[in-house]
Structure formats: structure tokens, C-alpha cells
Swiss-Prot record:
Signal sequence, renumbered to the chain: none
Phylogenetic lineage: Bacteria, Pseudomonadati, Pseudomonadota, Gammaproteobacteria, Vibrionales
Enzyme Commission identifier(s): 6.3.4.21
Species assigned in the record: Vibrio campbellii (strain ATCC BAA-1116)
GO CC terms in record: cytosol
Pathway where it operates: Cofactor biosynthesis; NAD(+) biosynthesis; nicotinate D-ribonucleotide from nicotinate: step 1/1
Protein name: Nicotinate phosphoribosyltransferase
Amino acid sequence: MTTNLFSSRIIQSALDFDVYKVNMMSAVAALYPDAMVSYKFIVRSEEDLSELLPEVKAEVLKLQDITFSTEEIEYIKGVAPYLNPEFVDALHAFRFNPQRDVSFNIKTMADGTSQLRITINGLWKETILYETIIMSIVSEVRSRARWAEVPVEQFQSVLEEKVRHLKTELKRRNITNFKFADMSTRRRFSFQAQRSMLKYLSKELPDCLTGTSNYHLAKELGLTPIGTVAHEWFMGHQALVNVRDSQKVALQRWQKMFNGALGIALTDTIGIDAFLKDFDEELSNAYVGVRHDSGCPYTWGEKMIEHYQSLGIDPMTKTLVFTDGLNFEQALAICEHFQDRVQVSFGIGTSLANDMGDYANAQGIAYKPLSIVIKMVSCNGSPVAKISDEPEKAMCEDIFFLMNLKRRFEQPLDLDECRGLIDRLEDEGDNYLIDA
């Protein structure tokens, strides 16, 4: 494994991002080339990152020097034949322009504290790749600024113990169908931590590890790149078509765009119940499976099985992919629960590349992974929303749009949730200390 958890430069390859970003970029370039969007970076952790602004900004600005090499272009063509070759060739000319697209601020919160804020604005097709890249930059800047003393051996020992325990449990429980992919890019401790982890897992768990969501590391380590679509695809459609039709249109156009090659549907942009109303027989047959990213995984899985059965579809011909903040133990329990009833697979992130166990610094402060997100907040000047199956994950900057969206999808209007959103919007009001 690695002897150093940090590199002198965080992003060293144009491919150091999650696979689904370039999938969506391809679809956006083909279908919505003129769409304008805005994204916002939000810190969910109770940790002030404002002092990291200069270093984060410096790393983001370095992206202007990153380009797709001919070797990388040819690699994408080889592993992603579902992408339009003309689109992939056009990546030769793609350039990040963070000076134009990305803004950095320090905000004063309602309680008087400060927090780092990052906004991304521009053409959807030109700004779509920033999300996972900027998140990985923030995470690593925070790690090397505040946790540089964490010994490599701490990370290694925690990972090795997890693998030992997993092997023991697989044998004890006689589980033979456990499959998972690495999805840690956005919230990794560092690039080197993710790289080291993948090298170790590919050696120790070759029959369980299906691949990684990171294109660069998939290429370097000979792993399968894993990824389909994210919430922003569905959120953008809320502003591009009639809002009530947005989810179904997004599903239909995605299916048509890739001829079924990227057939895992994300279910919780509006919520599982609203999703099932749109996921009709044609779509249920066309998509090979669905992905869970919020709410109770067991309740969700039972609903999906019941849905397939109601349409006369054998659930064993479909795959449920679970990606909501999992560790090995949680994934094993889900795997056992649905064994022989439906195919299952897992995406695991923070637990793999950002777990330091019980490590604490000299002041006795225990290490905790950073909780951060970047989400689309508007498309073509109109607000968009993610409702989610977990209220804490809901995102929308316009309370009236959220209420209308819920009404159109026949979702219950929770007054406490609405009050919480209003409080959050007030707390995140545009009160800047620094406009960098």
C-alpha cells in the first residue's frame, strides 16, 4: 500500500471524476446544449471550512491546465462504446474554465459563524464535470490542512480489518453473491487513499469488487468503470419540460439516448412512491434495475419487488443497487435479506476511502469524514429540487417551487419540513464576508 496519503497536486488527470458525470455530459450535449445551470456547494458537517478557501481556490484554478489526452480519449471509447464517438472525440477540445465558472465566498451564518461557499454557473454541458472534482479537492485540502498527521498505517489497518471481517462473515453466512463497487471519489480522504484502497481490494477481494466509479483509477488499475446517472439529470428536467412529466421524460430520454446500456434508474429525486407511478411496464422492462440512495433500504426493496411482481416481471431478472452511505456490515445485512428474491449490488464510498477508525489527534478530537454535497439549484433560471426519501437530504432554494412540485406529484406537504427549509434558506442567506 502507499507510504504517503497526499500528493503535491490533487487533480492530476482529466479522468479523475465519477463515471456518471461524462455519461450525463454526453446526454446534455446532445439534447440540451444551450441549457444554463447553477450548482451550490454545501457543508453538512458542523465544521467551518472558511479558512481553507485560498487553498481550495488554488487547487480548483489548476483545473484550467487539465486536458483529456489522446490516450484517455481512446480509453473512454474502449470502455464506453455507448457514448457517441463524436462526443468523445470532442473532449480533446474541452477545457475547464474555473475562473469563469466557479465562485468562492465566505458566508456569515445566522448564528454568527462562517462557512465556505462555492457556486458553479454556466452551460450545463461545460460545468457538469466540476461536482465530483471540486468535492474531492475540498475533502483532500481539509485532510492535509487539519489531519496531515494521520499515519498511513492507521488507514491501512482499518481497511485490512474490514476486509478480514468481511471474508469471515461471507464464509460464516454462506453468502456467495456479494458484489460491490467503489464510489468514494467525492468524499475520499485523498486521491492516494482511494488509489491505495483500490489496489488492496482488487488483490484481496477480486470476486467481490466489481469496479470503481473513478475513471482515472479504473484505467490505471485495470478495473471496470462503474456509473450511470445522478439526481441532476432528473432535476434539470424539472425546468426543461412540464414539471409533472419531468421524471418520466428524463427516464425515457435517458433510455433512448443510450439504447438501454446505462439501465439503472435512480428512484429518489421525487421519492419512491412518485417514482413507481412513473416507472410503468415499458420502463420497468427496459431498465435492468434501480438504485437506492435514501430512505429505508428494506422498505424500498420490498416496494420494488412488489412493483415488478405486479407487472408480471420476475424480480430475479432485475438488480437493486444500494448506495446510501453503506459499510460492509450494512451491505451484508441487505444482501442476506433479499437473497434469492432479487439481484443486489452495492456502491460503497466514504467507508472505503475515508475511514480512520478511532483515530484522534493530540487534542483528543476524533476524526470524522467531512459531509459535503454539490447540487444543482437552478436550470435556465428556474429552481429545481430534490425531495428524496430522507428529509435531511432534500434540497431546494425555493419553498414555493418545492410545494408545487410535491403537489404535482401528489406528495404530502409536511409543514415541519417546509419550516425547516425556510430556516435553512434564512441561515444560508446571501451574507458574504469575502467575495473571492
